[in-house]
Swiss-Prot record:
Superkingdom classification of source: Bacteria
Protein name: 3-hydroxyacyl-[acyl-carrier-protein] dehydratase FabZ
Reaction equation(s) it catalyzes: a (3R)-hydroxyacyl-[ACP] = a (2E)-enoyl-[ACP] + H2O
GO annotation, biological process: fatty acid biosynthetic process; lipid A biosynthetic process
Subcellular location: Cytoplasm
Active-site residues, Swiss-Prot/TrEMBL: H51
Job description of the protein: Involved in unsaturated fatty acids biosynthesis. Catalyzes the dehydration of short chain beta-hydroxyacyl-ACPs and long chain saturated and unsaturated beta-hydroxyacyl-ACPs.
Keywords on record: Cytoplasm, Lipid A biosynthesis, Lipid biosynthesis, Lipid metabolism, Lyase
Gene3D superfamilies, alphabetized: Hotdog Thioesterase (3.10.129.10)
PANTHER family: 3-HYDROXYACYL-[ACYL-CARRIER-PROTEIN] DEHYDRATASE
Record EC number: 4.2.1.59
């Protein structure tokens, strides 16, 4: 088990910022293998204003984005860029997405991603998001990494 990664360290691994950062903390990972992260869902999320008034539900596409961000963190931890460069991970594909549980304010989404394959700049991972022990969503995700100057 590795040390947890807080939001300040996450900001060094992802380009996302408010209101689109969807990973609050990494609680465990093993490079080139798996990562477990947390997203604390609060009523202050900007998407709850319109999804849905009086019945706030986290959009499924944002659960998938949270998994994609967890995948990008694992890929960033697993591969070092050249000096003065960083990797930007593009969401390149998704298969087998399934939604099993509604996510509402006050829930803590546990994001679990596992590396399924990596070839050059392409990363295939399987992700599952849980609320407690209940599966909220799952998907197979593909990302493409591009090395850019800082």
């Amino acid at each position: 088990m590795n040390e947890s990664i807080d939001i300040n360290q996450i900001f060094t691994l992802l380009p996302h910022r408010y209101p689109f950062i969807l990973v609050d903390r990494v609680i465990d990972y093993k490079v080139m293998e798996y990562l477990i992260a947390i997203k604390n869902v609060t009523i202050n999320e900007n998407f709850f204003t319109g999804h849905f008034p009086g019945n706030p539900i986290m959009p499924g596409v944002l659960m998938l984005e949270a998994l994609a961000q967890a995948c990008a963190i694992l890929a960033s931890l697993s591969r070092q860029p050249k000096e003065g460069h960083e990797f930007l991970h593009y969401f390149a594909g998704i298969d087998n997405a399934r939604f099993k549980q509604v996510v509402t304010p006050g829930d803590q989404l546990r994001l679990e991603v596992r590396l399924a394959g990596q070839k050059r700049d392409f990363w295939r991972m399987h992700g599952e998001a849980y609320i407690g022990d209940k599966l909220a969503c799952s998907a197979d995700l593909l990302s493409a990494a591009k090395e850019i100057k800082k």
